[in-house]
A protein has these predicted regions:
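Compact soluble domain cores
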Residues: 1-61
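Short, compact, well-ordered microdomains
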Residues: 56-94
Length: 94
């Protein structure tokens, strides 16, 4: 799956700055997300993610636990490749 431009929210950046998580760990999660390993999401979310990928439109949401911190990765797919983007965020930043 194409992830487009990658953005990290202020909350995630603060966790990195405070050494609670590492950039390398975020990259591992992004790789899992791009490989269609959505982490801890319900079966209906997996089905929706896969349908959105097949239609190349919509939102792909993954959820992971990293050091007891929930991390969400959200990709927005559009028909225009240059408009695809991915955000690494905390759930409360959604």
């Amino acid at each position: 799956m194409m992830i487009g431009a990658l953005h990290i929210t202020r909350g995630v950046q603060t966790l990195i700055d405070d050494n609670k998580i590492q950039y390398e760990e975020i990259w591992e999660l992004v790789h899992r997300h791009a490989s269609m390993d959505y982490g801890d999401v319900e079966d209906d979310s997996v089905e929706l993610n896969n349908s959105n990928i097949n239609h190349n439109y919509g939102t792909i949401l993954s959820s992971y636990q990293l050091h007891n911190i929930k991390i969400w990765i959200c990709t927005t797919l559009t028909e225009e490749v240059q408009d695809i983007y991915t955000i690494v965020m905390l759930p409360e930043e959604y």
